[in-house]
Amino acid sequence: MLTKWDELMCHQLPATMDQVHTDSPEWTERIYVSIYNVRAQDTIFGFGVGQYPNKNVQDGFATVWHRGRQYNFRASRTLRPCVDEVRIGPLSVELLEGLKRFRLKLDENPSSLRIDVEWTATMNPHEEEHDFRESGGRVVQDISRFDQAGRARGILEFGSQSITLDEESWWGHRDRSWGTRRPLRTDATDTRRRPLLHFCSAGRSRSFVTMRSIGVSSNVARANIPI
């Protein structure tokens, strides 16, 4: 399908820009940002978006860990027809300046999390070596990636608290990747696996999404968020 991206002079396939070079369901494009308070060292903020054109899905999350308590938000939507924007309900990423600045937002939603943060690079992006792997003659990983350090300013709200971020105290990094990757599995019967920090939680953590904790007993609140 045609999108505004098809006006750009950067096609690399005889197809519209919403299509990729393979029909593999594991073809994925991701944005991941991690920001932390280097002064107080008591708060970590994570934000991510994934796009899966061959599954017709875009999803995202935001999470804040503050003094032993974690707050989570996750959402997903059908990708098409809105393939030319990074927005899943109240969660969005706005590019302000290529390879330099972007804005992360989480507007009004059923969780206690609210976010409006601008991230600015403090170094040039580092392009990692291409990651290509085969198994049994089949491509299982074929990924390009770059990462970059930066600083952040803006507002974080969670629970009953509001924190103002300034670039002197809030540093972080981002990871940008695209390509075919190994599938992530979340088989609840496999108790050998440990929960991921940004997707599973335990103890006093609060979550406002439907998710599954793996290998731990969890005291997690759940609520579906229709997008």
Predicted feature locations:
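Structured soluble/peripheral alpha/beta segments that form catalytic or ligand/cofactor-binding pockets
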Residues: 1-227
